[in-house]
Amino acid sequence: MKFFRHHKLISVALVGAAALTLTGLINPAHAADGGDKKSLSVSAKAPINTMDSSLNTDAYGAQSLNNTMEGLYRYTGQKLKPAVAQSIAKPTNDGKRYTIDLKKTKWSNGDPVTANDFVYAWQRMVDPKTGSQYSYIYSGIKNADAIVAGKKKPTELGIKALGPYKLQIDLDHPIPFFDTLMSSSQFYPLNKKVVEKLGDQYGLSSKGMVFNGPYKLQNWKVGDTEWTDVKNDSYWNAKNVKLNKVKYYTIADPNTGLNLYDTNVLDRYQNLNGDTARQLANSKEFGTDPSNSTYYLELNQKKIPALKNQKLRQAMSLTINRKDLANIILGKTGIPAHSLVPSKMSKDPQTGQDFTKTDQALADQKYTAYNPTLAKKLWQEGMKETGQKELNLTFTADNTDTTKKLAEYLQNNMEKDLPGLKLTISSVPFKTRLQREASGEFDMSTSAWNADYPDPTNFLDLATTGNPQNNGKYSNKAFDQQEKAATTTNANNPAARWQNMQNAQHILTQDQGIIPMYQDTTASLTKPGVCGFNITPTGQYDMAAVYKK
């Protein structure tokens, strides 16, 4: 799921001054738990673009959907538990059929949540008329690929209601990560009556919407920088939701954020980075959470044919000192990434070895090791092979100070080490950057992906030919074959599947078809007494578990 760094950097001098005020942050007189223990205020990473689970593509909308909706299963911290489903179902028919009994739960307007709500939502998701960029995530569910391609009707999708509270799901082939997939927002139910009444305005405002999760979104419309979630008393597990209200503030400037935190407007200030994080790292209220998200560069090989040259892409990657980028530019809130797949997310089912620490993965780090001398050599060879004397690229990046500094760092390194390359930075809002990527109107861009489910294929699939999220149009038949085998032929063979994914990662890393930069960590300031911020494998927080002492 698309992701970006939102908060701005401030100068060392300003951060130093702000840090002096942080002595008040740990003063009991300032403690947040002295106020309303049923209300919480936190900073938001970005405004919500849509609350339509069929159309959302970014991690920020996913967090809000996770707060207010739920599907068959739900992550509580790192543990997957039944949500609308009565239990975690076991597959039959050689792993290709799931029969799932549902709890008798309700929407926030009192309507029952039924099996048909799932059928409607899923069929809507794969219907080409909906225009979902995420319809590909249904691949493997019976007939999904054919429906997305317009070859079959949405009603032929492998899901049907066997009764008001019983679902049958049929697959084309086993999906090893099916259970975790069912926690994703793309598989949430929808109230057909509400969606059709609101039409193309559905998800653009909280007015008229209904929710089946722990909270309800109130008084929100697209473009708002503040919004409120209130406890959903109709939620089946409402008795275990400790907070009555969660207030979100989108904060662009760290000075503003620190001031709001210091004056107790915020209970939690999230997504610190750069100088801010570095200067506040010793505060007792500072903490970090790992995140299964990778930040990378996309090169538009369709618009700029020269970028199809492997040597040019390899050269660009070798100019990046990922250690300096993580430590200096990001203030140690990032980890150097040598592959698109995040570290500590997936383990070999037989040996327990991390996906990014195998012998092959470690050997492939030579393709991402800082080596300006080799970069220049490869660049000159690639330029000769493509008949280029110079290459002028527009570098699209988010218009936050952190990303601006990152873009300038890459610009300086690449122009210095790669003769004939000129990068012109175009800093634009997050939403504009996503639009440019989706329409192909970019040469080179910073992008990121946050796990929808903790499996290497969720990241590797981004580079498959024809994937809607493959904005750079990288294509390699051998890579595609390995990915296809991992998700189809060898789906029920853990050892063979693991090797397929390792092979795919090797091909992509060698090609630098997508150039990984760093893996994100989430740095935050949290008031004493605020508890339960447990991150899930998909990088979200289960706000139903958060409470104040």
Please name every model-derived segment:
Residues 233-279:
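Ligand-site clamp/hinge motif
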Residues 59, 174-241, 245, 255:
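Gly/Pro-rich hinge or "lid" segments in bacterial periplasmic/extracellular proteins
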Residues 86-134, 263, 306:
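Aromatic- and charge-enriched surface segment that lines or borders ligand/interaction sites
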Residues 222-224, 369-451, 519-522:
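Ligand/substrate-recognition segments at binding pockets and active sites
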